[in-house]
Amino acid sequence: MKQILKILVFIVPICIFAFFYTYLSKDNSYPGADYRVFEIPSFDLTELYQKTELSNEDLSGNFLINVWASWCITCRVEHGFLEKLSNSGIRIIGLNYKDDRSDAIEWLKKYRDPYELVIHDFNGSLALDMGVTGAPETFLISNGKVIAHYRGEVNQIIWEDVFIKTIKDSEIIL
C-alpha cells in the first residue's frame, strides 16, 4: 500500500502539470481556428451554375474555400465581408453545403456572388471529408493543402488574426 501511495504522489503532480501545460500552451484566443495542415480531399462534384464536373485537380494556387448555404443565417451575416475580400482581389471558391441548387442560385442572385466558382456539395460529402461541422466555415488553401481553417463567421478581426497571420507566416500570396 505504501508503494502505491509513493507512486501516486510522484505521478499525480506530473499528470496535473502535463494537463495544465497542454491547456495553457494552446492558442485559445479563437476556438474556431484550426491550423492542422492537410491536403484537399479528392472529390468529383459539379459547379453550381453550369453543372460542369469539378474535381480537386481543377483547383490550383492559393485561395479561400468558404462553406455556405442558403439556409444558413450566419452565412448571410458573413457575406458582406466576403464581398469585400473578393473585391480586393482575394480568390474565394464557394462550397455550397447540403443545399438545393435552385435555392443557392437564387440566394446568390439576391445577395451577389463573391465567388470565383461555386462547388455544389449537395450531400455534404466533400465538406464531411474536410471536417466541416456546419456553415459557415472557411479554409485557407495553398497549393492543394489546407493551412488554416475557421469554424464560424469570418469578419475583419478573424481575417486579420487568423488568416492574415497565417498568410504572413507561410509567406504565400493570395
Residue ranges, per PLM feature:
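N-terminal targeting signals for export/organelle localization
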Residues: M1-T46
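Short active-site neighborhood of thiol/selenol oxidoreductases, capturing the structured segment around
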Residues: E53-R76
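Structural microenvironment flanking redox-active thiols in thiol-disulfide oxidoreductases
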Residues: R76-Y111, F122-D129
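Short, conserved active-site loop motifs that form the nucleotide-linked donor/cofactor pocket
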Residues: I90, E116-L117
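Short, solvent-exposed mixed-charge patches
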Residues: S170-L174
